């Protein structure tokens, strides 16, 4: 097994789609005796989340430049140089055996600093279309990994899936319970909620409930609880609906659900596959390069999900898809199995194995 005392610098931040897969790898390597340190930014979610998992984190000063104003773009090169120097200082002090970049602003300067120091750089891209940072770093990385086929077209990349929590992998292996009479719909719109779900679901459930028992667990996002609850009440549907700003225990939510209505973020798609749940995917229309549509195609092509572009989504289309699933529980179960069939369940171990191999060669 891995010799104790090896060191890895993990770079991931900004969103849960970057941070949680990186945490899965970090936890795995820490259990093997590795010393883990994190590189991130002080104003994003990693600053709060990473220390909760027991890992030390260093911060550099860097922000995105895509879509920003002229002055910020002109100043960007100077800020990038400064952030590379900050990352070099962290690397010089920590002396990692390998550096793992999994997306977010800090990965760019940190990746450049790692290669300048002669340290192996492993990249992992979670989305079907690479972000700007990983696209640039892929040219200098020692090893490029990705979750989906054909993500990178100009460099060789190994497809390993997305690292996810072991609890969800175990959940997907559990026998599925007998279906209740009521269709159980889990609605997840991210930490801020999804306005389109909050607007359409109350009326869609009212339409559906005329012919079918349905219960809903709806995560509405910050500050949306009162308004969405009132909308369900207005449509006479407050009895069978559990409304929450956040769902802290996604394992429990996935275990409860028959079908999930959600966006098509990379981590969400990978989790749906791992737990074996059918889904209705509505990609976030403003995602960079429309990468969520590409993410969702993996489940759609497997026959495990429906994909509805937000531009054409309305109450009747949403109610119709839910009715279709409610009326054919056999097909619903098949969709769940197809989702599980395309899951990559050892992504964490594969990413860790690459890091271990490069560290040992060094």
From Swiss-Prot:
Record: residues binding UDP-N-acetyl-alpha-D-glucosamine: 15-17, 127, 165, 191, 247, 266-271, 292
Keyword hit for Oxidoreductase: no
Top EC class for this record: transferase
TM stretches of this protein: none
SUPFAM superfamilies: UDP-Glycosyltransferase/glycogen phosphorylase
Compartments reported by the entry: Cell inner membrane
GO cellular component, one term: plasma membrane
Record protein name field: UDP-N-acetylglucosamine--N-acetylmuramyl-(pentapeptide) pyrophosphoryl-undecaprenol N-acetylglucosamine transferase
Organism (species): Shewanella baltica (strain OS155 / ATCC BAA-1091)
């Amino acid at each position: 097994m891995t010799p104790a005392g090896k060191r890895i610098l993990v770079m991931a931040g900004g969103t849960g789609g970057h941070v949680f897969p990186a945490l899965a790898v970090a936890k795995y390597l820490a259990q093997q005796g590795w010393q883990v340190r994190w590189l991130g930014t002080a104003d994003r979610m990693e600053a709060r989340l990473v220390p909760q998992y027991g890992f030390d984190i260093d911060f550099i000063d860097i922000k995105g430049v895509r879509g920003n104003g002229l002055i910020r773009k002109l100043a960007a090169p100077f800020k990038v140089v400064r952030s590379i120097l900050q990352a070099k200082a962290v690397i010089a002090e920590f002396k990692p055996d390998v550096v793992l970049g999994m997306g977010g602003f800090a990965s760019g300067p940190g990746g450049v600093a790692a290669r300048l120091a002669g340290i192996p750089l492993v990249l992992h891209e979670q989305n079907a279309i690479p972000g700007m940072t990983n696209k640039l770093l892929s040219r200098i990385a020692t090893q490029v990994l990705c979750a989906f086929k054909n993500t990178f077209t100009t460099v060789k990349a190994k497809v390993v899936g997305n690292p996810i929590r072991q609890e969800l992998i175990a959940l997907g292996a559990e026998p599925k319970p007998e279906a209740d009479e009521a269709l159980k719909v889990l609605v997840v719109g991210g930490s801020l909620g999804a306005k389109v779900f909050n607007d359409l679901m109350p009326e869609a459930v009212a339409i559906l409930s005329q012919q079918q028992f349905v219960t809903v667990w709806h995560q509405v996002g910050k500050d949306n609880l009162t308004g969405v609850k009132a909308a369900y009440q207005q449509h006479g549907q407050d009895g069978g609906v559990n409304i929450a700003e956040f769902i802290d225990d996604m394992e429990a939510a996935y275990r409860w659900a028959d079908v999930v209505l959600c966006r098509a973020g990379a981590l969400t798609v990978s989790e749906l596959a791992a737990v074996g749940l059918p889904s209705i995917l509505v990609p976030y229309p403003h995602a960079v390069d429309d990468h969520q549509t590409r993410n969702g195609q993996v489940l759609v092509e497997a026959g495990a999900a429906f994909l509805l572009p937000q531009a054409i989504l309305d109450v009747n289309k949403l109610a119709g898809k839910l009715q279709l699933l409610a009326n054919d529980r056999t097909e619903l179960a098949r969709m769940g199995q197809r989702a599980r069939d395309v899951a990559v369940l050892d992504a964490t171990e594969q990413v860790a194995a690459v890091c271990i191999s490069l560290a040992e060669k060094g």
